[in-house]
């Protein structure tokens, strides 16, 4: 049973969340977990102006995802930063290249799940995940969120990410915040939750 985590991260927040998602998925017996990043679309000079070059270098060891890997997976957990309440352009361009999979019905019946980040507490995390779900549903995927069985969603003693739609984290306007332990716990729970359902469906 193969679980694919496909993400884009500019400053490392989604990368760290992806690692936590993978940790959770690997807790499920029989789960083969792959972490992949979607292709970068911004030129090097733009990344340099945005102060993202060093982080990109740190993630260089993560293989770039191919369209074929989506078809090979039993479950796909996507990670994207929020861009104006939607998925980032890099993820959008990657998914726009999946028309061939749609024509063949290659993703029909596979599990799909999403996690995200935003600069601010109300920066569009829920709209990003919900609008992402539209693409998954058009592909015939079965959408999985983050249930309230994860008790960390009920905390009000600190600023946290996460919703029933998926795990999330708040990066800060300058990227100064790292995912909190609660955010990472949510990501682990989501990874394990998706992998557990995939394992049951694979029997």
UniProtKB/Swiss-Prot annotation:
Q: Which residues bind FMN?
A: 9-14, 82-84, 117-123, 138
Q: Which residues bind substrate?
A: 102
Query: What general EC class does the enzyme of this chain belong to?
Result: oxidoreductase
The UniProt catalytic activity note for this protein reads: a quinone + NADH + H(+) = a quinol + NAD(+); a quinone + NADPH + H(+) = a quinol + NADP(+)
As recorded in UniProt, its EC number(s) are 1.6.5.2
InterPro entries recorded: Flavodoxin/NO_synth, Flavoprotein-like_sf, Flavoprotein_WrbA-like, FMN_Rdtase-like_dom, NQO
Instruction: Recite the UniProt keywords alphabetically.
Output: Flavoprotein, FMN, NAD, NADP, Nucleotide-binding, Oxidoreductase
Binding note for cofactor: Binds 1 FMN per monomer.
Asked if the keyword Secreted belongs to this entry, the reply reads no
> What cofactor(s) does the depicted protein rely on?
FMN
Q: Which GO terms describe its molecular function?
A: flavin adenine dinucleotide binding; FMN binding; NAD binding; NADH:ubiquinone reductase (non-electrogenic) activity; NADP binding; NADPH dehydrogenase (quinone) activity
Q: Which domain of life is it from?
A: Bacteria
Which SUPFAM superfamilies does the entry mention?
Flavoproteins
Extract one GO cellular component term from the record: membrane
Q: Flavodoxin-like domain: which residues?
A: 3-194
**Binding site residues for NAD(+):** 11
Q: Pfam families per the record? A: FMN_red
Matching NCBIfam families: flav_wrbA, PRK03767.1
* HAMAP family (alphabetical): NQOR
Q: Which family does it belong to?
A: Belongs to the WrbA family.
Name this protein carries in UniProt = NAD(P)H dehydrogenase (quinone)
Q: Which organism is it from?
A: Geotalea uraniireducens (strain Rf4) (Geobacter uraniireducens)
Question: What is this organism's lineage?
Answer: Bacteria, Pseudomonadati, Thermodesulfobacteriota, Desulfuromonadia, Geobacterales
């Amino acid at each position: 049973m193969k679980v694919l985590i496909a993400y884009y991260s500019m400053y490392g927040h989604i990368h760290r969340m992806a690692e936590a998602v993978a940790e959770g998925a690997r807790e499920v017996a029989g789960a083969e977990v792959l972490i992949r990043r979607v292709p970068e679309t911004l030129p090097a000079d733009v990344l340099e102006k945005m102060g993202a070059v060093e982080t990109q270098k740190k993630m260089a060891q993560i293989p770039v995802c191919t369209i074929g890997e989506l078809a090979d997976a039993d479950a796909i957990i996507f990670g994207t930063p929020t861009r104006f309440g939607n998925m980032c352009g890099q993820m959008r361009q990657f998914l726009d290249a999946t028309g061939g999979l749609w024509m063949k019905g290659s993703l029909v019946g596979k599990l799909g799940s999403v996690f995200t980040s935003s600069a601010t507490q109300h920066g569009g995390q829920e709209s990003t995940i919900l609008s992402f779900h539209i693409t998954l549903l058009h592909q015939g995927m079965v959408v999985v969120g983050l249930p309230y069985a994860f008790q960390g969603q009920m905390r009000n003693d600190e600023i946290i990410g996460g919703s029933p739609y998926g795990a999330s984290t708040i990066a800060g306007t300058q990227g100064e915040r790292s995912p909190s332990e609660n955010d990472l716990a949510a990501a682990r729970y989501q990874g394990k939750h998706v992998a557990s359902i995939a394992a049951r469906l694979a029997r």
